[in-house]
Amino acid sequence: MSTSATASPSLVGAAEPKIYNPWNPANKEIPVAEIARINRCEPKRVELYRQACVHKSFVAREAHEGQLISPRPDDCMSLKHADNEHLEFVGDGILDAIVGDYLERRYPGEGEGFWTSLRSDLVNNEHLGGLAMKLGMAPWLIMSRHMEEVCAGRSNRRMLGSMLEAWIAAMYRDRAADDPKTAFWRVQQWVIEVLETHVDFGELIACNTNYKDQLLRAFQATFHQPPRYKEVATEGPLHNRIFTMGVLHPDGSVLTTATARNKKEAEQEASRLALIRLGFAAS
C-alpha cells in the first residue's frame, strides 16, 4: 500500500503571514531636562509629556488576522500603551482659546474675519509643526519605522503639530494637578511667549495661504453667499484614503476640484484654484 503523503487541504494556497515591523531605533524617550528646557520650569507629571510625544503608529495593538509582529531588536524601545491623540484633542481646544484671546487683544478693532483667518494660519498643523521644530521637539517624537522612513519622520510637520497640541494639554494637566486656578494662565503665558518669540506676524498676515477663507470673503462679496464643497470621489483603502473635493459654483455646478490625502487639504487646493478661475487671484 502506498504511504506517500498528501498536502493538507487546509494548507493548500495558504497565504504567508504579513510581518509588521514597527521597531524604530531612532526613537528616544525625552529626558526630564529637555521637558524642563522647553517648558522653562520643572515638570511634575513627566508621563504626560512623554505620552504627548507618542504617535499612534507606535502603540501596542493586536495583530490583525494573517499578520505577525516581528521580534523587538535590542536597540529599540518597547511599544507604548497610549498615544497622544486624546491629549491632542484637549490641546487643540486650549490653543484655540488662547490664540483667539491673544489676537483680539493684539489687533483690537480688526474684526472677527481677520482674527479667525489669522488664528487659522497660526494653529494649522503645518505652522504648529514649524514651531515644534523651533522648540527642539522633533528629536523626541516617537513613531513607527514606517512613519520614520516613508512619511518624512521628524520632518513631518503635521505629526509635529499634533505633538505640540498634545504637549499643551500635558502642560495644562500637569499644572492643574498642582494649582487648578492658575493652570490655564500659566499655559497661556507659555503659548504667548512661543508666539512672540518665533512668529513673524507681519509676514504671516502678508502671506495668507488660507484659501478657503479667501474664497469665503470673495463669495460673500460677489455672490452674497458662502462657497459650498462637495466630495466628488474617494479612493483607496480605509487606512490610506485619497479624497477629491470640489468647490460648487452658486449655480450648483462643480467649479474646481483637487485631490489630497485628507479632505481639508483637498478643499484648500480646490479653493485656491477657484480663486484663480474666478479672477480673484493670479495663477
Predicted regions and their residues:
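Double-stranded RNA-binding/processing signature
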Residues: 1-283
